[in-house]
Amino acid sequence: MFSEELKAFRRLGIRHLLLQALNFASVIASGLMMWKGLGVITNTESPIVVVLSGSMEPAFYRGDLLFLTNPSGVRFHTGDITVYKVPNGDIPIVHRVLETHEIAPNATFVPHKYNRAYTPEDQLLLTKGDNNPIDDTGLYTQGMDWLERKHIVGKVRGFVPYVGYATIAMNDFPQLKYGLLGILGLMALIQRE
């Protein structure tokens, strides 16, 4: 089945193999640069995330691909769908803002006014999954009742349904991920262009 490919692989010189490996590395590096560039444009460490659970049904289903932004200086409102990571949490969580609260440590006086102007960083959020019966305080770190702005990864701006199932499959079955990477690497090495 792969006899022709193996013969072609043996006929290639070391110089050609190194060139193909360099081309493969440049494709990987280009992908990483695009990911980081998208992160800079959207002001978030993860501009694209996959929904991993059914906690946001019927708004989003497991496997939906979400596009995020996190503009600084913009306040969150009740009903906004956010993605957040709690301290010592590995997986970002996609849930809706249930309630907002203001704190005043960074507040400044507005001239000729008796009230304070709050910055978006002074905002605290309480979230809940649409399909969950209670709010997320049980998911937060112990002693944490509200999310701070530093915990927010981004606000959902759009989605593509079910495209993220490929990512879920590769995480659930690591052999699939390594097999696909191996096939891609082999194809890059034996490609004759």
Curated annotation (Swiss-Prot):
Topology in membrane: Single-pass type II membrane protein
Swiss-Prot/TrEMBL keywords: Endoplasmic reticulum, Glycoprotein, Hydrolase, Membrane, Protease, Signal-anchor, Transmembrane, Transmembrane helix
Active-site residues, record numbering mapped to chain: 55, 95, 136
Transmembrane segments: 17-41
CDD domains per the UniProt record, alphabetical: S26_SPase_I
Entry's free-text remark on domains: The C-terminal short (CTS) helix is essential for catalytic activity. It may be accommodated as a transmembrane helix in the thinned membrane environment of the complex, similarly to the signal peptide in the complex substrates.
Family affiliation: Belongs to the peptidase S26B family.
UniProt protein name: Signal peptidase complex catalytic subunit SEC11
Species of the source: Schizophyllum commune (strain H4-8 / FGSC 9210)
